């Protein structure tokens, strides 16, 4: 019995030693892997984010471009969607690549950021369509009016953003004048678009006190719109126009600021 007890104790001791050794080896292995990962990460950071190994990087990248180009990954087509007012040559100039250039050499983020420098472009999406096409989707700003401020004229979009000083191609748009007119022009234009005949006869919309609008119509007719709910006043003016009671009544001014009582002045 005593010999068996001693034998069992020896076996337990050996098992304990084996487990302890395996644990130590396991910990050493984990530490070695961790150190290897850290070294590898440092090497990658040095390779990518520093000037070390510049010649090696250049050599590798150049060879990758050459190989992929031979495999057909080269620029052959450029698809542009959403382009209306931005000059196509300007877009291609920003692309800055010749036909058959390595398609992977194109820096898409840089192209996108450079395109956004155009005041016409609100948003842009650039992607590769492998193996040989670059796709450019433009979201241009849509001009809604011509804004006059400090004796200068600007083409503006629905947000009041100044797109361009070249207003000639858009001379048919509503002319808005005054401080803040660019910000509030969108709502006025949207309402006037409900009455095309009235919009067509509106020459200028003047922002008064940054609170309300005065409209100057053809025939030297001036209309003072209310500060609030000017939509009702526009509906009234359109009704007068449709019944031929606006432009052939010798009207000089219509004061519609008081919704309960309208004032009409004749020449």
UniProtKB/Swiss-Prot annotation:
It is found in: Cell inner membrane. Gene3D superfamilies: membrane protein fhac. InterPro entries: Cell_div_FtsQ/DivIB_C, FtsQ, POTRA, POTRA_FtsQ_type. The chain crosses the membrane at residues 33-53. GO terms for biological process: cell septum assembly; FtsZ-dependent cytokinesis. Pfam families: FtsQ_DivIB_C, POTRA_1. The keyword Nucleotide-binding does not apply. One of its GO terms (cellular component) is cell division site. Residues 73-141 form the POTRA domain. Its main location: membrane. It is a single-pass type II membrane protein. Residues 1-32 are cytoplasmic. The keyword Transmembrane applies. Essential cell division protein. Belongs to the FtsQ/DivIB family. FtsQ subfamily. PANTHER family: CELL DIVISION PROTEIN FTSQ. This is Cell division protein FtsQ. It comes from Rickettsia prowazekii (strain Madrid E). The lineage of its organism: Bacteria, Pseudomonadati, Pseudomonadota, Alphaproteobacteria, Rickettsiales.
């Amino acid at each position: 019995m005593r010999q068996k007890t001693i034998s069992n104790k020896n076996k337990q001791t050996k098992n304990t030693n084996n487990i302890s050794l395996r644990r130590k080896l396991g910990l050493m292995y984990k530490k070695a892997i961790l150190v290897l990962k850290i070294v590898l990460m440092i090497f990658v950071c040095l390779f990518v984010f520093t000037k070390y190994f510049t010649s090696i990087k250049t050599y590798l990248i150049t060879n990758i471009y050459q190989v992929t180009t031979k495999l057909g990954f080269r620029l052959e087509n450029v698809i542009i969607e959403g382009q209306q007012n931005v000059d196509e040559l300007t877009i291609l100039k920003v692309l800055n690549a010749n036909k058959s250039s390595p398609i992977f050499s194109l820096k898409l983020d840089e192209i996108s950021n450079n395109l956004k420098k155009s005041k016409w472009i609100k948003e842009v999406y650039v992607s590769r369509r492998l193996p040989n096409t670059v796709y450019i989707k433009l979201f241009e700003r849509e001009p809604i009016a011509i804004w006059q401020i400090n004796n200068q004229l600007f083409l503006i979009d629905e947000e009041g953003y100044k797109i361009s000083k070249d207003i000639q191609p858009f001379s048919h748009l509503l002319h808005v004048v005054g401080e803040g007119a660019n910000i509030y022009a969108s709502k006025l234009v949207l309402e006037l678009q409900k009455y095309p005949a009235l919009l067509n006869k509106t020459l200028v919309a003047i922002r008064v006190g940054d609170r309300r609008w005065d409209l100057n119509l053809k025939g030297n007719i001036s209309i003072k719109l209310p500060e609030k709910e000017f939509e009702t006043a526009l509906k009234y003016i359109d009704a007068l126009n449709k019944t031929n009671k606006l432009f052939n009544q010798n009207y000089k001014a219509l004061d519609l600021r008081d919704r309960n009582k309208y004032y009409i002045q004749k020449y």
